[in-house]
Amino acid sequence: MSEKAILSCRDLGKSYEEGPESVVVLSGLQLELHPGERVAIVGTSGSGKSTLLNLLGGLDTPSKGSVWLAGEELSALGEKARGKLRNRALGFVYQFHHLLPEFTALENVCMPLLIGRTPIPEARQRATALLERVGLGHRLEHKPAELSGGERQRVAIARALVNKPGLVMLDEPTGNLDSHTAQGIQDLMLELSTSMRTAFLVVTHDMNLARQMDRVLHLQEGHLVAI
């Protein structure tokens, strides 16, 4: 593709020291994602999928190579600048949603906007519009404990998208849901990635979800292989 990548990594590697030995988890990874592209990463438990996601999201430091997000090399940024870039250009969705239990659905979705110093009235308006878009306009004032598993994951997706990031990373987004609810979340993700032109990078064991992506990559023995 000629369009500039929203995310790329070059010769990415990660290893850990265990006594006198160095254990290589990831080695020589190359990856590019472009606006609106949907990519799944699959692999066995312990293959390094979550480690890779943490490296690509700037939550961990590679042993080798570089990661570029929205045109910025993550390793060249200080911690504060890296945090600002993540809040602006990147959204995260986890298997267990990680919503703040003491806040309502609306307040949870407002949070990234408020961190970015968006005025409260504007933040509430944007968060409300996105919650309505994911089918939760009637649940704005409900706290996570009052929502179903599928509803909580919809709130998490809305929170990830509220800053209109170029990329959303999802770590097993349907892994804790029944098949019917998981299909609804999959359909929602596909619709939003198309309509908002957001790139989605999904780590999953769910091959049904993976097959709906534009590309599927298998993480095996520290390397990414196209399926």
Curated annotation (Swiss-Prot):
PROSITE patterns: ABC_TRANSPORTER_1, ABC_TRANSPORTER_2, LOLD. It is found in: Cell inner membrane. Disulfide bonds: none annotated. Residues 7-227 form the ABC transporter domain. Signal peptide: none annotated. InterPro entries: AAA+_ATPase, ABC_transporter-like_ATP-bd, ABC_transporter-like_CS, ABC_transpr_LolD-like, LolD_lipo_ATP-bd, MacB-like_ATP-bd, P-loop_NTPase. GO terms for molecular function: ATP binding; ATP hydrolysis activity; transmembrane transporter activity. It is a peripheral membrane protein. Transmembrane segments: none annotated. It comes from the Bacteria. Part of the ABC transporter complex LolCDE involved in the translocation of mature outer membrane-directed lipoproteins, from the inner membrane to the periplasmic chaperone, LolA. Responsible for the formation of the LolA-lipoprotein complex in an ATP-dependent manner. Belongs to the ABC transporter superfamily. Lipoprotein translocase (TC 3.A.1.125) family. This is Lipoprotein-releasing system ATP-binding protein LolD. It comes from Pseudomonas fluorescens (strain ATCC BAA-477 / NRRL B-23932 / Pf-5).
